[in-house]
Amino acid sequence: MIQAAGIYLTETDKMNITAADFGLNQIKTEGVQILTLFDTDRMAAKILVLLPYQTEPEHWHPPVGNDPGKEEVIRGIWGDLTFYIPGEDNMKEGFIVEGKEKCYTMRHEIAIGPGDQLILPPGTKHWFQAGKRGAVMYSFSTKVTDLLDQFTDPNIIRETKIEE
């Protein structure tokens, strides 16, 4: 999908794409594919990919020490993408993952097309979902602290745990 969106990938890039299922074991429904372009002590850039109708679960980036939390700018590249943030419930395009009504509380819908941007201040609850074609987007942010993200769904595990 990334290459179909017109972004050149090196062989190393292809090897570095990761998939996050958040410990839910239903990646086609809830998850995201991630290519980290760079991640320094101050800023980061990623390409995020959602498969058709895939949803990244509701979360927010909390304060860490004296840092107010990750600030993020999303820029649509390709596909059908909808973000859900605080605000009036105007949800009509997307859907709540079956049985997860309490885990997706943000219902203010914003469609993000190619070239559209959305700025998410630190601590902003959000989730996003692809439509029938899937979606590709850039995520530009301040320092990445993703392992500290908070999720509305109590069953989410952000870090993979290996059981013996």
Per-range role (PLM):
Residues 51-52, 69-91, 96-99:
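Glycine- and acidic-residue-biased ligand/ion/polar-headgroup-sensing regions
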Residues 29, 47-68, 87-89, 111-114, ...:
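Conserved short histidine dyad/triad with adjacent acidic residue
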Residues 47, 73, 127:
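Short, surface-exposed charged micro-motifs
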Residues 41-43, 52-56, 80:
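Short, charged/polar surface micro-motifs in flexible loops or helix N-caps
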Residues 88-105, 125-164:
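Double-stranded beta-helix
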Residues 57-58, 66, 83-84, 110, ...:
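Short beta-strand His + acidic residue motifs that chelate non-heme Fe in jelly-roll/DSBH
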Residues 1-47, 64, 98-102, 164:
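A short, N-terminal "cap"/entry segment at the start of jelly-roll beta-barrel domains
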Residues 44, 70, 98, 106-107, ...:
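Short, solvent-exposed loop/turn positions at domain surfaces
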